[in-house]
UniProtKB/Swiss-Prot annotation:
Cited SUPFAM superfamilies: Family A G protein-coupled receptor-like
Function: Odorant receptor.
Designated gene of the protein: OR8G1
Molecular function terms, GO-annotated: G protein-coupled receptor activity; odorant binding; olfactory receptor activity
Residue ranges that the UniProt entry lists as topological domain Extracellular: 1-25, 76-99, 161-197, 259-271
Disulfide pairings: 97-189
One BP annotation, GO: sensory perception of smell
Source species of the chain: Homo sapiens
GO CC annotation, single: membrane
Protein family (similarity comment): Belongs to the G-protein coupled receptor 1 family.
Pfam families: 7tm_4 (PF13853)
Annotated Gene3D superfamilies: Rhodopsin 7-helix transmembrane proteins
Name listed for the protein in its UniProt record: Olfactory receptor 8G1
Membrane side Cytoplasmic: residue ranges: 47-54, 121-139, 218-237, 293-311
Membrane topology term: Multi-pass membrane protein
Organism lineage string: Eukaryota, Metazoa, Chordata, Craniata, Vertebrata
Amino acid sequence: MSGENNSSVTEFILAGLSEQPELQLPLFLLFLGIYVVTVVGNLGMTTLIWLSSHLHTPMYYFLSSLSFIDFCHSTVITPKMLVNFVTEKNIISYPECMTQLYFFLVFAIAECHMLAAMAYDRYMAICSPLLYSVIISNKACFSLILGVYIIGLVCASVHTGCMFRVQFCKFDLINHYFCDLLPLLKLSCSSIYVNKLLILCVGAFNILVPSLTILCSYIFIIASILHIRSTEGRSKAFSTCSSHMLAVVIFFGSAAFMYLQPSSISSMDQGKVSSVFYTIIVPMLNPLIYSLRNKDVHVSLKKMLQRRTLL
């Protein structure tokens, strides 16, 4: 491909998670199982919330949106990865690669800000319950959700637009299991200063701002929980908060490891492992974490199953 610019690039080869033939089938079965759980969990959560009228509140609208984002986020990446496990040459065309990159960025960035919106919603509900229904009205909730998607679309458009101006004239093997920004830029033979600057600035905004919002929200939430007199109530609240924080730490920690570390010490092999957490593991865990201790979700699911049994 030497000497050719990006207009003549027709395809790339994805290195995948592992090049060892004996691992391909076990990895295929593992990630197929994870994807099935992700699809059932997230689509099930979204369907349950929209079919249960008593779950039509801002908290559950946010949760429904997160489940939809997680489903889309995983679907952009996992099916192609599964196909690559069972094919000899993992080829992806240039248009497919750019499309995958764009939608991956849309949903990954949207998830960052959706998690922040959900943390703010819980902060208002726990720390300012009297003002909650005024500040987090249905209109405000839908505006926040719309804003989350707009940020995702705008940031993804900027990144992908800048990627179209990059000239690819090196070895066409992408050392990753999907088309991501940093692995693609490793193949460039033109200046990528603007792209790297964008990754640093936009990445800092999309990772650090939501992270700080979530951190501040949970500091105030924990402070409020400490004032709960009931030991049982305090223990239950801490248990719920800790499970939510675990999902947040895994998502933002792995994303920060991939995008915010200096490029001189960046390792694509380590990056592939960290990417698995925020692209595949977290979308599977979120519906389990956010619904496992939720009585309203349990009641709605029980009612829906009873209705289906009667029918």
